[in-house]
A protein has these predicted regions:
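C-terminal structural segments of small proteins and small subunits
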Residues: 66, 75-93
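Short S/T/G/P-rich N-terminal loop/turn motif that feeds into the first structured element of a domain
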Residues: 1-54, 59-70, 74, 94-105
């Protein structure tokens, strides 16, 4: 069953963030991922407008998406982004389908 990375980012330094973003497609390809949207037009409809870049990436399975995130290559790319203060990201892994809402943690 497909699964998705859903990322929200606040880009602080576009030049440095691009260096990070340019590294990611080759990493994703190793996990069979497909970029569905990456930085296109958006409008905040609810909530605070903290983020200015949105990305949705499809993986063949939930496990492949998690493995990609924890791969050495992606960890190095993310560390570069954080070290250079290029941007702040929030990333969730979501499996396709519908289920009951989770209880509060």
């Amino acid at each position: 069953m497909p699964a998705y990375w859903v990322a929200r980012a606040k880009v602080n330094d576009p030049v440095e963030y691009k260096k990070y973003a340019d590294r990611v497609p080759a990493i994703l390809a190793k996990y069979g991922a497909k970029v569905l949207t990456r930085g296109g037009r958006y409008q905040t409809l609810e909530g605070q407008e903290k983020f200015n870049r949105f990305v949705v990436i499809e993986f063949p399975t939930f496990e492949q998406g998690v493995a990609c995130f924890y791969s050495q290559e992606y960890r190095e790319a993310a560390a570069f982004r954080r070290r250079n203060k290029a941007g702040e990201n929030e990333l969730v892994m979501i499996e396709a389908g519908e289920s009951q809402p989770a209880q509060a943690r």
